[in-house]
């Protein structure tokens, strides 16, 4: 469904491959100026390929509110490695300290709407973010709109966000009928997967069932131990299948190596979840938080 809404200025921090722009485009929301802060050259290349009019403004540490026009929507997913179970688990002291850059830019721009995405984390870290943003997070699992298990927290002043309807998608629903041989597991990989871990073969830990949901895509899923393996087909997921798990159009990330495609998809957003949240801008005025009142 398309939504008749126009935004003059959108600012995306940690823009990656521009998932925010893709979600807005999915909703048919016109954006006159989309400012993107990102430093990964491969993600920037994909963003430029799909949205050549994007205004790239470099690293978040160099973004200054005084240099920007009035921002209608500020979005971002600050690096989550230090919060994530799959990452460093060092909280605010690791890479995730870039969250404070989001807070700084939020204060400097005082946007009409804002949205921050991050992984599930320790309650103490979640509470710090909630205190700084002035809104409580909403937990939405991408499994409702895709074939991927991906629970994420969303802090936003866009009101009345409900859970998306469950589409009932399974991994088998998004798989390609054919794939390149390079995605098949080697004999060495199959042997490794047959070894025991805690009394069970690794197949039990690293495989995705055809009649179930895929495990959460990660930025390092292309490294080392076979991850995202389809046991019934003895192969890994393809980049297009990972795009489908994130509800990204087929071959949106084409143009860089498979390694970089997997990385940016693992770092990215599930588009239909973001669109589900952003569509409420059409119907509801923003919640004015106490933090925003302090800036008036």
What is each of the regions a protein language model found here?
Residues 40:
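Conserved SAM/SAH-binding beta-strand->alpha-helix loop
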Residues 5-10:
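Extreme N-terminal starter segment of soluble prokaryotic enzymes
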Residues 53-59:
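Conserved SAM-binding strand-loop segment of SAM-dependent methyltransferases
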Residues 33-35:
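Short beta-strand element of Class I
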Residues 47:
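Conserved SAM-binding loop
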Residues 13-18:
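Class I SAM-dependent methyltransferase "Motif I" SAM/SAH-binding loop
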Residues 2, 63-73, 78-235, 241:
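Class I S-adenosyl-L-methionine
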């Amino acid at each position: 469904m398309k939504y008749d809404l126009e935004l003059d200025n959108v600012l995306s921090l940690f823009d990656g491959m521009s998932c925010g722009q893709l979600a807005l485009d999915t909703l048919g929301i016109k954006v006159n100026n989309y400012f993107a802060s990102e430093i990964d050259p491969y993600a920037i290349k994909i963003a430029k390929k799909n949205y050549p009019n994007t205004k790239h403004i470099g690293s978040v540490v160099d973004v200054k509110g005084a240099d920007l026009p009035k921002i209608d929507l500020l979005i971002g997913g600050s690096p989550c490695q230090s919060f994530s179970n799959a990452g460093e688990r060092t909280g605010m002291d690791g890479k995730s300290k870039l969250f404070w850059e989001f807070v700084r830019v939020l204060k400097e721009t005082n946007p009409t709407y804002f949205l921050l995405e991050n992984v599930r984390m320790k309650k103490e870290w979640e509470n710090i973010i909630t205190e700084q943003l002035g809104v409580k997070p909403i937990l939405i699992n991408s499994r409702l709109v895709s074939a991927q298990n991906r629970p994420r927290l969303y802090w936003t002043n866009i009101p009345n966000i409900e859970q998306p309807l469950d589409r009932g998608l399974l991994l088998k629903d998004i798989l390609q009928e054919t794939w390149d041989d390079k995605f098949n597991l080697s004999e060495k990989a199959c042997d490794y997967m047959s070894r025991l871990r805690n009394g069970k073969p690794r197949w039990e830990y690293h495989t995705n069932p055809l009649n179930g949901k895929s495990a959460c895509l990660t930025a390092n899923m292309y490294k080392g131990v076979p991850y995202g393996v389809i046991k019934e087909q003895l192969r890994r997921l393809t980049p297009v299948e990972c795009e489908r798990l994130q509800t990204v159009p087929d071959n949106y990330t084409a143009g860089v190596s498979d390694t970089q495609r997997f990385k940016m998809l693992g770092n990215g957003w599930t588009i239909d979840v973001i669109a589900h949240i952003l569509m409420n801008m059409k119907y509801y005025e923003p919640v004015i938080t106490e933090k925003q009142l302090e800036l008036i």
